Amino acid sequence: MVPPTAIAEASRSGGEPAIKDPVKDTILTPRFYTTDFEAMAAMDLRPNQEELEAICEEFRKDYNRHHFVRNEAFDGAADKLDPETRRVFVEFLEQSCTSEFSGFLLYKELSRRIKQKNPLLAECFAHMARDEARHAGFLNKAMGDFGVQLDLGFLTANKAYTFFKPKFIFYATYLSEKIGYWRYIAIYRHLEQNPDSKIFPIFNFFENWCQDENRHGDFFDALMKAQPSSVRGLQARLWCRFFLLAVFATMYVRDVARKEFYEALGLDAREYDKYVIAKTNETSARVFPVVLNVDHPKFYERLERIVGNNNALSQADASGASAPVRLLRKLPFWGANALEMAKLFFAAPIRSENYQPAIR
């Protein structure tokens, strides 16, 4: 396949949006996933089949079929942004597009591979793939307003895929969908109250958009309840804590590092993330056996230490020193981050029946 840089040069000469080089993979960038398709196909849905069938019926209605239609508000909107705001906004669009496209690829492949053996599950994944493709295409089109786009075909063929067992897919995608809901709805509500901070018309679409994320999260909630072992027992409690911490820490460190984007929207990145983390943690108690104690004063103190360590790691990378010297400079900060994450993981969690007794 032709590398994206070569395509970019051809695109510039033809007046089309340039194809943007994918960002380098790091611990903070969206990942592409694959799983054990045979195990997924063999899943017995009977413990919660009624709820899954009801969710599938909701998917069939495709409430947002006509929602993602660009209008005249997009005309010239990109030209109104200053260079720095353009830069951080394009970064946001790229990260969001990559994340949505990652979901599309996983759901589409699942729907295709399990269709014969588990048609209900396959249909649900097909509907979610439809939604994710729609989101990714809409975001990529918005990037085109700024003169660049992602080559999604190139990403499909060249991105590294991480293998997760099905239950890990459940934890990771459930949290991704639910945290996506709270991120989008928080931005939408803030901009409704502060319209002068609405830097681009794509935010007008976030209210309906986030309902897709919410429905997808509800599907994984129902699927985990159909596989009770995924949310029962000591092992499940430990894995739920791990994924909650991994998702929350990754988001917090990433968003603080690109706080300029949130400042452009009139938001404080730290306060925004604290709100999203609190709401996602609360929502997760509906299905996870335990959640994190995010109100403990040490929780954000330790995350801030990780932010500081990551800044030091970035400075080491940019120092111009030789590779061995950079490695030696970075080792203490990697170790410090590992220690802080271990302290966060082993902090006492909150049992979900105590957190949301009425719901559970």
From Swiss-Prot:
The keyword Disulfide bond does not apply. The keyword NADP applies. It comes from the Bacteria. Residues 1-20 are annotated as: Disordered. Keywords: Chlorophyll biosynthesis, Iron, Metal-binding, NADP, Oxidoreductase, Photosynthesis. GO terms for molecular function: iron ion binding; magnesium-protoporphyrin IX monomethyl ester (oxidative) cyclase activity. It catalyses: Mg-protoporphyrin IX 13-monomethyl ester + 3 NADPH + 3 O2 + 2 H(+) = 3,8-divinyl protochlorophyllide a + 3 NADP(+) + 5 H2O. Signal peptide: none annotated. Its EC number is 1.14.13.81. Pfam families: Rubrerythrin. Its cofactor is Fe cation. Belongs to the AcsF family. Catalyzes the formation of the isocyclic ring in chlorophyll biosynthesis. Mediates the cyclase reaction, which results in the formation of divinylprotochlorophyllide (Pchlide) characteristic of all chlorophylls from magnesium-protoporphyrin IX 13-monomethyl ester (MgPMME). This is Magnesium-protoporphyrin IX monomethyl ester [oxidative] cyclase. The lineage of its organism: Bacteria, Bacillati, Cyanobacteriota, Cyanophyceae, Synechococcales. The gene is acsF.
